Amino acid sequence: SPWQQVDDTLTRVDGQNQSCHVVCNPLYSAYFTRPGKDRLTVLGVLYPQAQRTYCLNAEARQLLEHIQLPRATRRCLAQWQSVPGLAEGPFLSRLDAELPRLTAYQRQWIITAAAIAAYHADPLWPVIDTLVCDDAPQFDWLTADVMHCWVHAGRPYKKLTPYVAAHHALRDAFLTRFWDYYRELRTYQQAPTAAERERLSTAFDTLFATHTGYVHLDRLIAKTQAQKAILLRVLEHPELPLHNNAAELAVRQRVRKRDVSFGPRTPEGAKAWDTFMTLADTAKKLGVSFYHYVYDRVSQANQIPKLADLITERAKELGLGASWGTTGRGASTGARTPWAT
């Protein structure tokens, strides 16, 4: 599907803190234990390569508009446009040779922008169009769009601690309207129409134009209003979930595993955790007994189809990318999930 859900949680490998990243949709869950949780790490999860490649094209330069770079640096980077993609070694060597005075922050941004551009420029990889996630910054810029979880958007309101009874009433009244609107979005998903899409867009503006006089509440309302585009992706693509519960539940399984077993002691052990948790959760979503699946593979009976084939078949039935059409990259509902085996 052209959309995926992502989340991460702390894990420990040989007593050292690392991160477990989860990528999922209604048909599978994939676990990846990595040393960090920065944007490049998440990119490596979405776009696994034996050796990362880089591309300083127009998209990379556009991403670099978000930071301040000297004009001389931008002119130097513009000369790289003719290079379609570089392997990591040559890219970093050239970067160090031609721009030795970059700060660590500037260098990291250039590396990240070039890696993201290479991911988007790869014609052979199913590039994800939309990530459903929370508002963690490492998920920004990786895909054309993101959709933030409505449950996460509602949590700051619940965490408000008003000391005045009137403020309590204002918060509770607004939360009631907030979740009423959320339920209207869920209803829209069942039978989307252009008229209802327009009405809900206008209703969002009305709801989050509310001024209560309770300063902290009004600040939260204004913050949510500024996120209209990323909260209302569902109006254009009704297949998108309104919340990220699926990824959070997958993460919670890793937390429970961590509570019982503390953590793997070696990288191989971490890979084994990831592999078996991926298989177990994916089999569950596909209605396959994990016990019978493992027995089938160990006994070499091979009576149960490959999970990847089941995912492809179910994806066609569910139409997870129907509103994107079937001609764009990554939009085909029959595209094979790259992590499933």
Name what the model sees in each region.
Residues 1-341:
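Catalytic center-proximal scaffold of phosphoryl-transfer enzymes
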